[in-house]
């Protein structure tokens, strides 16, 4: 099994790239992490609700094109389930033991995720009700994936 992180938009800030690279390096071959960046749709300043929904659907179609049959899909959503690090570790472990495909985490674009992506998801995770920049959320999620692996291996990293 591989863990994939499908994200909408390009990561620009060096400090975030460096932080993510550090956790990816630490994970090594334990449970490989692949990050897939998808181009975000350009949103006109005066986009109507209908136009915004069409853009969100196009981004959703791009996301779903990266999901294979058998993959376990966890999306980040403000209204999702609040989880502890231990609960996330349990989810990762079950996907590793019982899964038939990869474990895929998704961070959507500034418009959020399409209804189709929500319907395909196996789990909706919330990191709280606060809005965080999508690029910062990548670092937070990658750290939590690393932490989950350390919990599952009985490491002292998680205290």
UniProtKB/Swiss-Prot annotation:
Q: Which reaction does it catalyse?
A: pseudouridine(1915) in 23S rRNA + S-adenosyl-L-methionine = N(3)-methylpseudouridine(1915) in 23S rRNA + S-adenosyl-L-homocysteine + H(+)
* Gene Ontology MF term list: rRNA (pseudouridine-N3-)-methyltransferase activity
The Gene Ontology CC terms held by the record are: cytoplasm
| Annotated keywords | Cytoplasm, Methyltransferase, rRNA processing, S-adenosyl-L-methionine, Transferase
Gene3D superfamilies per UniProt: 3.40.1280.10
Query: What is this enzyme's EC?
Result: 2.1.1.177
Q: Which Pfam families match?
A: SPOUT_MTase
Q: Does the keyword S-adenosyl-L-methionine apply?
A: yes
Reading the lineage from the top rank, the first entry is: Bacteria
Query: Partners and quaternary state?
Result: Homodimer.
What family does this chain come from, according to its entry?
Belongs to the RNA methyltransferase RlmH family.
Recorded hits in HAMAP family, A to Z, give: 23SrRNA_methyltr_H
Protein name from the UniProt record: Ribosomal RNA large subunit methyltransferase H
Species this protein is from: Lactococcus lactis subsp. cremoris (strain MG1363)
């Amino acid at each position: 099994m591989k863990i994939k992180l499908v994200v909408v938009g390009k990561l620009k800030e060096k400090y975030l790239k460096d932080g993510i690279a550090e956790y990816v390096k630490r994970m090594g071959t334990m449970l490989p992490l692949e990050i897939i960046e998808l181009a975000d749709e350009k949103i006109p300043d005066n986009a109507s609700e209908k136009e915004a929904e069409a853009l969100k659907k196009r981004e959703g179609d791009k996301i779903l094109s990266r999901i294979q049959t058998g993959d376990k899909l966890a999306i980040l959503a403000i209204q999702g389930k609040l989880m502890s690090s231990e609960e996330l570790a349990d989810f990762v472990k079950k996907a590793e033991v019982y899964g038939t495909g990869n474990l895929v985490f998704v961070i959507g674009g500034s418009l959020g995720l399409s209804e189709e992506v929500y319907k395909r998801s196996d789990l909706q995770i919330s990191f709280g009700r606060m809005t965080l920049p999508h690029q910062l959320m990548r670092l937070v999620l990658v750290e939590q994936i690393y932490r989950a692996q350390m919990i599952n291996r009985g490491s002292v990293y998680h205290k």
